[in-house]
């Protein structure tokens, strides 16, 4: 009887795992359009390519595949919202993905913030990670901002450090900020609950992986903050009428499977 039950379990479980692993290769390319609400004359839109949570320990998409997924749209800005890796041996691997993104020739550059997994690294290894990003054309932001002049007008790219590891400094990130479109990059979207007193036009984040194993419900995310309990774990949401986006990410943590979620790259038209 035990042998029969074991055989049945294997017959069910092996195809399930196979499909769950295949899901990690089935990348969805989303396009999100954010309407202008500032009351000013209509301006030219910018196209932002947003990637999050590469988790190079468990990524099923090669740099070449990433390039082919994204090459058919013009790119103005590339935004990377953290959790590149958590093991130092994978730092060199990141360069291949950054080179693929540079081939897209973003008109106004590539920008990155860090996530909780990046901070698992020892300080010297974290600095190596940061160096690889910067040597491959990426501007890293840790509670700071940069201002860029675009065909759509000035854009302030505000990079707020990871909220889940208590590294966020909202006040410091906004210090001496001038007028313009305020685009916030951060890893953990829970930070929006502490941003009611500051303005942003759009915020990009990741962290939750869309649940990764979202079946029947992503109960394992409960410990990851209030937004989960508000059923905000992926996609476009509004808080106090301000839009923010939670990417499902490109890689996986733990086991390299996805159930009820898929890896994502997103184009945001702002």
From Swiss-Prot:
Q: What species was this sequence derived from?
A: Bacillus subtilis (strain 168)
Q: In its UniProt entry, what is this protein called?
A: Uncharacterized metallophosphoesterase YkoQ
The positions annotated for binding a divalent metal cation 2 are 83, 116, 207
Q: Does this entry carry the keyword Secreted?
A: no
Q: Which cofactor does it need?
A: a divalent metal cation
Look up the EC number in the record and give it: 3.1.-.-
Q: Which GO terms describe its cellular component?
A: membrane
Q: Which GO terms describe its molecular function?
A: metal ion binding; UDP-2,3-diacylglucosamine hydrolase activity
User: Binding residues for a divalent metal cation 1, per the UniProt record?
Assistant: 53, 55, 83, 209
The free-text cofactor remark is: Binds 2 divalent metal cations.
């Amino acid at each position: 009887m035990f042998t029969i039950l074991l055989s049945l379990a294997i017959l069910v479980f092996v195809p399930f795992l196979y499909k769950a692993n295949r899901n990690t290769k089935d990348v969805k390319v989303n396009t999100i359009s954010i309407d202008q609400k500032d009351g000013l004359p209509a301006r030219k839109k910018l196209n932002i390519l947003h990637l999050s949570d590469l988790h190079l320990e468990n990524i099923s998409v090669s740099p070449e595949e990433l390039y082919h997924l994204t090459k058919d749209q013009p790119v103005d800005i590339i935004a990377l919202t953290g959790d590149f890796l958590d093991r130092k041996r994978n730092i060199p691997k990141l360069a291949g993905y950054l080179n693929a993104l540079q081939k897209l020739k973003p008109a106004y550059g590539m920008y990155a913030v860090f996530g909780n997994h990046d901070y698992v690294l020892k300080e010297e290894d974290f600095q190596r990670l940061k160096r690889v990003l910067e040597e491959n054309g990426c501007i890293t932001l840790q509670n700071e901002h940069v201002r860029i002049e675009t065909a759509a007008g000035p854009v302030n790219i505000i990079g707020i450090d990871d909220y889940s590891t208590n590294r966020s400094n909202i006040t410091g990130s906004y210090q001496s900020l001038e007028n313009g479109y305020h685009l916030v990059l951060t890893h953990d979207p829970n930070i929006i609950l502490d941003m009611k007193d500051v303005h942003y036009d759009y915020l990009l984040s990741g962290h939750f992986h869309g649940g990764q194993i979202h079946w029947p419900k992503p109960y394992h995310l409960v410990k990851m903050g209030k937004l989960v309990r508000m059923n905000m774990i992926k996609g476009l949401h509004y808080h106090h009428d301000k839009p923010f986006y939670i990417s499902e990410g490109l890689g996986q943590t733990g086991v390299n499977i996805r159930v009820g979620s898929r890896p994502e790259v997103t184009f945001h038209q702002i």
